[in-house]
Amino acid sequence: GFARLNTLVKEWAIPVVEYWGTEVTLGSDNPMLAGSDPEGWLSAADVIIVIDSQAPWIIEESRCNDSCKVIQIGPDPLFSRYPVRGYRADINLAGETDEVFELLQEALQPHVAAKQRQVAEREKHVLNLIQHAKNQRESLLHANQNGAIGKPWLSYCLGQLANQHQGKIVSELTTMPQFAGLTQADSYYQEALAGGLGEALP
């Protein structure tokens, strides 16, 4: 679903936040990549689409509007095997993410012409917010470069190597993907919230 999602969010100016992402959702060259912090985006959103995420934000720290519609997408969007999960789900779309994105594109296509002005206005607003966050990350990346290597700079260097050699970063809380600048699908993997319990690599 990487390519289809990248196209869909650009066409409709939909900002994407990768909160605790275990893989690359959008390439860093996609203008709609809004970083890793949902704070600010949640409270302003009228619709939130959660893509196959068991914990899309920390409920105690960030909250969405009561009037906001929350759409959960994934093979099991309710995570039905979990005894308790406190995230809202106004609409659930069960299925493989790539297939759901394809159906969403088809459903939205007839509305492209009528929504052009609205999308253009949203795009301008979203890009301003994203640029502000990028400037903050750039400042942090280049701050205190006095010989010591911090996580942001290490992540940036690893990302440059991965992009250059079509490599893959496998990380356990070491790499900060928001600084890595990865542009390709399958170029990053981080253990799930269970800390790699029951996982293995070939």
Regions found by a protein language model. Give the residues of each.
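Catalytic cores of large soluble enzymes that bind and process phosphate-bearing ligands
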Residues: G1, D37-G40, A89-E96, H142-G150, ...
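Redox- and metal-dependent alpha/beta enzyme cores, enriched for Fe-S-associated oxidoreductases
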Residues: F2-V16
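A short acidic, amphipathic alpha-helical/loop segment
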Residues: A3-T7, I59-R63, C157
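Active-site diphosphate/adenylate-binding microenvironment
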Residues: L5, L127-P202
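Anion (oxyanion) recognition and catalysis
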Residues: K10, C64, N163
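General beta-strand structural signal in soluble alpha/beta enzymes
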Residues: V16-Y19, V50-I51, L93, K168-L173, ...
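Glycine-rich, acidic loop regions that bind phosphate or pyrophosphate groups
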Residues: E18-L127
